Amino acid sequence: MYDEDVDYSGNLCMFLDSASEEEWAKWLPSGIFAGVTTNPIILERDGRECNIAALTELAKEALAYDAVQEFQVQTWGKTSDEMWQNGIALAKYDPDVIVVKVPGTFEGIKAANALVTDGIRVTITAAYASHQAVLAAAVGANYVAPYLGRMNDAGRDGFGTIVEMQKTADKLDSDMRILVASVRNVGDIAKLAAAGCDTFTISAKVAEDMFGDPLTNQATLDFEESATRIGAYREAEEAQERARLEAKAAEAAAAAAAAAEAAAAAAAELEGGSKPDEDDARV
C-alpha cells in the first residue's frame, strides 16, 4: 500500500496497464509493479463497467494485492466540472492510493487544477507533445502520461518527445513523474530508462516479454539440467521415496491389523455358535 512517509521519487516505478483480474493475479506478485493503471478503453477491453460504483469495487480488488501502492483510474465528462465531480467520487474510496487520470485538454487541465486543490492526486493523460509536461507541472499534477507508441504511429518522434519531457521535469525541479504509456516493446523501456525515464506502465504482453528472453530461458534450462545431474534434487527425491515407503508400510500394517481383527471376530463368532445350550446339557 502507499505510504505517505516514503519518498517514491527517484526510484524506478512500473505499473501494470490492465483491468483484468487474471492478468493481475499473474503479474502483480512478480515484484516489479507498484500499481495498476486503467482507462475507459482498457475497462471496455477487459469487460469492466465505467461508473463510480463499479470502479470503486475495481479499486478494492486491485488494492487487495500487497504490491499495489497506487491505483490509477480515469475520470470522464464533457466539462471540467463534470470531470472534477467524477474525479472526487473516484478518489473518495482512498485518496492516498487512488490517482485520478485527466486528459490534457483545456477542460481537463481546469479539472485537474481543481482536483489538486482538493488534495486529489492527478495524472495528466493522453499527452502527445513536450509542452504538455509544462502544463501538467503548472497545475501540480503527480504524473503526465505520454503515449509513446501512438506518437510514433502518428509520425511523431515519440522517444525524443518523452526524453524532452523528462528533461523539462528535471529542470523544473518538479516531483512530477513522466509516466510513459503505450509502450509496445521492451527495447523502448531500456532506451528510455537509459535516457533518464523512471516510470512506465506496460501491458501484460510487454510484461511477458520482460521476462521472456529466449537465451535467458535456455541458460536456465541448462543450469537445471546440470544441477539435476550432480544431485541438486537427490535429497528431495530420497525424502519422497522414504515417505512413499513409510506410507506403504503403514498401509500394509493397517491392512494386517484389520485382517487380524476380522479373524478374531470370526473366531469369537464360531466359538459362540458351537457352545451347547442349557437344555442340551440336562439330557
What do the predicted segments below correspond to?
Residues 10-24, 29-32, 38-114:
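Active-site beta->alpha loop and helix N-cap motifs at the rims of alpha/beta catalytic domains
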Residues 31-35, 94-97, 114-123, 138-145, ...:
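Glycine-enriched alpha-helix->loop->beta-strand junction motifs that scaffold or abut catalytic
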Residues 40-44, 144-153, 197-216:
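Glycine-rich phosphate-binding active-site loops on the catalytic face of alpha/beta enzymes
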Residues 209-233:
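C-terminal helical cap(s) of enzyme catalytic domains, especially alpha/beta-barrels
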Residues 39, 100, 136, 192, ...:
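Conserved, mostly hydrophobic/aromatic
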Residues 22-28, 86, 131-138, 184-197:
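Catalytic cores of alpha/beta
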Residues 56-70, 93, 109-118, 160-178, ...:
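Alpha-helix-loop-beta-strand connector modules within alpha/beta enzyme cores
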Residues 15-17, 72-78, 96-105, 121-134, ...:
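Catalytic beta/alpha-barrel core
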